[in-house]
Curated annotation (Swiss-Prot):
Localization per Swiss-Prot or TrEMBL: Nucleus, Nucleolus; Nucleus; Cytoplasm, Cytoskeleton; Chromosome, Centromere
This protein's name: Protein RCC2
Keyword field contains Repeat: yes
GO biological process: activation of GTPase activity; cell division; chromosome passenger complex localization to kinetochore; establishment of protein localization; focal adhesion assembly; integrin-mediated signaling pathway; negative regulation of focal adhesion assembly; negative regulation of GTPase activity
Length: 520
């Protein structure tokens, strides 16, 4: 087996990422816990301090930071321009889901209300002792006979989704904001069909911290969960939307999507990119962080409540000149907690949003308000074919198969300020990669590989009575002989689709322990 040696790591935060405090208008006051203190010493490039606005561009939508505006109670649904395409020019699409087929395996933390927190909130106290840390792969007893083609979670998420081979969407996990789509806010211990979407053929889904998007085979998007920052794209701001609702968008069919902590990105069939939700670090790509001074000197954020097109892509020359990059056709999009990555038709990578720890790959820690070209992938033969975003880091797979990493997974260690090859995985053909808060899991060739710093909660899958963490990439021995079609990772749990086509594969899966969670 080729060398597999480590990467950098991050200590877990006591709260669930960048927890937001209290109800607010539009985007709310800046009195909440922020990512801003993340600015750190780094291996190259300089850190930025204070609030950087990113490039000032002539004719840029939004025009940077706003200094004052009336403290109104948020945009009315009709005030924002809804993307609309005439019916006669709309593409007719029939999207297909993943070709993967297999059984779902889970490992990691399953006490959903405790994930990323010091203790279970009082309102969830009844669930305090439900769930456990699964140190090795388990099968869900309730999914016997259910074949899965896609699993979904997110680096900020304590909930998960699966799409069956029939195109049905199931969900389970934390549900305080209705992000499971079952019409209530009750926690769900094991995968359960979302009845409200049972008549739809779902091909793709995405998880934010407390919200969810689901894409149908006709290119329509349904959203549910928290909507305080407008991240559901429904034209309003509400605490919770527990049942699936179609977003306010009537443009070309959507083909891809991704969720950050409190924002969402969509890509249409023509390669246009749209964003909505929290604009705080510029992650929406509209040349603004949406900040304005409300009454009593409160800082609030002008959230995007419906999808808005990302219109400007730029590159910066060595002498600091800003040049527009024309004719960008988006092919893929990925979101971290507060940053966004895009892959275009020319295999170029753009990144923007929060710049802490070098997660944008521009050799500086400055926030970027519009998509900025990552230079490394803009050379012949050096283009990217896959992109992945972690909580505070980014990955890309080059067209020759090399894995590149930038940012940090352990924020107490040195950051990687620009894309560097991950030597540990040199020579491996990477099929699927996923990031949690600070752990990584990879499906490559016939193996599943994971690594992550202490503390971990079983998401690395090394098994009972084994080391629980590793700063070096290691094969997951508990999955020896099991082919991982796809991997996904939540804040501190992992999901795997294990191929079950041959009798030998089925037999190996049957030997894995079955997990039947306790319920109230």
């Amino acid at each position: 087996m080729p060398r597999k040696k480590g990467a950098a790591w991050e200590e877990p935060s006591s709260g669930n990422g960048t927890a937001r405090a209290g109800p607010r208008r539009r985007g709310g006051p800046a009195g909440r816990k922020r990512e801003r203190p993340e600015r750190c010493s780094s291996s190259s490039g300089g850190g930025s301090s204070g609030d950087e606005d990113g490039p000032e561009l002539d004719g840029a939508p939004g025009g940077g930071k706003r200094t004052a505006r009336p403290a109104t109670a948020g945009k009315a649904a009709g005030a924002a321009a809804i993307i609309t395409e005439p019916e006669h020019t709309k593409e007719r699409v029939k999207l297909e889901g993943s070709k993967c087929k297999g059984q779902l395996l889970i490992f990691g933390a399953t006490n959903w209300d405790l994930i990323g927190r010091k203790e279970v909130p009082k309102q969830q106290a009844a669930y305090r002792n439900l769930g456990q840390n699964l140190w090795g792969p388990h099968r869900y007893g309730c999914l016997s006979g259910v074949r899965v083609r896609t699993v979904v979670s997110g680096s900020c998420a304590a909930h998960s989704l699966l799409i069956t081979t029939e195109g049905k969407l199931w969900s389970w996990g934390r549900n305080e904001k209705g992000q499971l789509g079952h019409g209530d806010t009750k926690r769900v211990e094991a995968p359960r069909l979302i009845e409200a979407l049972s008549h739809e053929a779902i091909v793709l889904a995405a998880c934010g911290r407390n919200h969810t998007l689901a894409l149908t085979d006709t290119g329509s998007v349904f959203a549910f969960g928290e909507n305080k920052m407008g991240q559901l794209g429904l034209g309003n701001q509400t605490d919770a939307v527990p049942s699936p609702a179609q977003i306010m968008y009537n443009g070309q069919p959507i083909t891809k999507m991704a969720c950050g902590a409190e924002f969402s990105m969509l890509m249409d069939c023509k390669g246009n990119l749209y964003s909505f939700g929290c604009p705080e670090y510029g992650q929406l790509g509209h040349n603004s962080d949406g900040k304005f001074i409300a009454r009593a000197q409160r800082i609030e954020y002008d959230c995007e409540l419906v999808p808005r097109r990302v219109a400007i892509f730029i590159e910066k020359t060595k002498d600091g000149q800003i040049l527009p990059v024309p004719n960008v056709v988006v092919r893929d999009v990925a979101c971290g907690a507060n940053h966004t990555l895009v892959l275009d038709s020319q295999k170029r990578v753009f990144s923007w949003g929060f710049g802490g720890y070098g997660r944008l790959g521009h050799a500086e820690q400055k926030d970027e308000m519009v998509p900025r070209l990552v230079k490394l992938f803009d050379f012949p033969g050096r283009g990217a074919t896959q992109i992945y975003a972690g909580y505070t880091c980014s990955f890309a797979v080059s067209e020759v198969g090399g894995l590149f990493f930038w940012g940090a997974t352990n924020t107490s260690r040195e950051s990687t300020m620009y894309p560097k090859a991950v030597q540990d995985l040199c020579g491996w053909r990477i099929r699927s990669l996923a990031c949690g808060k600070s752990s990584i899991i990879v499906a490559a060739d016939e193996s599943t590989i994971s690594w992550g710093p202490s503390p971990t909660f079983g998401e690395l899958g090394y098994g009972d009575h084994k080391p629980k963490s590793s700063t070096a990439a290691q094969e997951v021995k508990t999955l020896d002989g099991i082919f991982s079609e796809q991997v996904a990772m939540g804040y501190s749990h992992s999901l795997v689709i294990a191929r079950d086509e041959s009798e030998a594969e089925k037999e190996k899966l049957q030997r894995l322990p079955e997990y039947t969670p306790r319920t109230l």
